[in-house]
Amino acid sequence: MYVYLKRELQAFTKEKYEKAFSSYFFTDSTEEFLLDFAFWLKERGIRNGNKAGLTHKLRLLRAVCRQAEKKEMYGVNMDNFLCLGDDINWPETTSRAVPETVIAKIANVDRTLFTKKEQLHLDLFLFSYYTGGMANVDVCNLTWDLVQEDRIVYERIKFPKTAKPELLSKAKAIMNKYRGQSYGNYVFPVFTHKHTTTSKKTTRVKQISTRLSQTLTKACKMLRIKENITWYSARGSFISKMVDAGNNPYVVAEMAGNSPLTIYKHYYKNTKREEIKRQMEEMF
């Protein structure tokens, strides 16, 4: 992700200022520079009919500067990012969490009705759910050296956060199922010798994520599940289940690689409304 950001900044400084990005220092990350970069991304997004990953790239740049500030590198001024306003903030999102009963149905679906690749998709989704809602890109890039005896410790690719999910027996079983079938030191057979660059790996993750969602749609139709489930649902579902079970939000956040505020704002969803209503009827 950071290599991709570097390429973006190289293209930006060359096009906007006719200068090489290698000639820039942290002192050059002024408000004017940041606003110009944001505007450049917006213009390109308009031309391409998308948002050009505006918020994600601005947040990546801020994360780089924050790490530099922690290391006391000269010229970093985090206050400059305030000029970006809402451009650097994620829009309000709706949690895609589903009840644990829905996840259980998917876990117990008749696998003989799915192809070998579709079974991999189901396993990747369930593994994500069992490991703190691990993001698709992190599941695909997971390597065996990050797996400890009782937990997984990894740096999230999209955000500069460390996640430490407990390693459940169900997650272990899924990993061991694919042991020896993957390229290099990867846990799952997602990448091959052809995926030699960050760009190729990113494309591969997008491709398998789309196909995984299609497999989940197929499973939902077979199981008569009404919810629209995607890979993203695993994260919210794990967090909601753990919080509803009374676990400390800080512990849950550490497993997911988020802050307690973030898990409540973006991922938690009350999936037990009927149960709570029954309890309230008894209480009142």
Located regions from the model:
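Short, basic (Lys/Arg/His-rich) helix/loop patches that form interaction surfaces
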Residues: F114-K116, Q181-Y183, S213-E254
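Short, polar N-cap/turn motifs at the start of nucleic acid-interacting alpha helices
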Residues: D145-V153, K226-E227, N247-H266
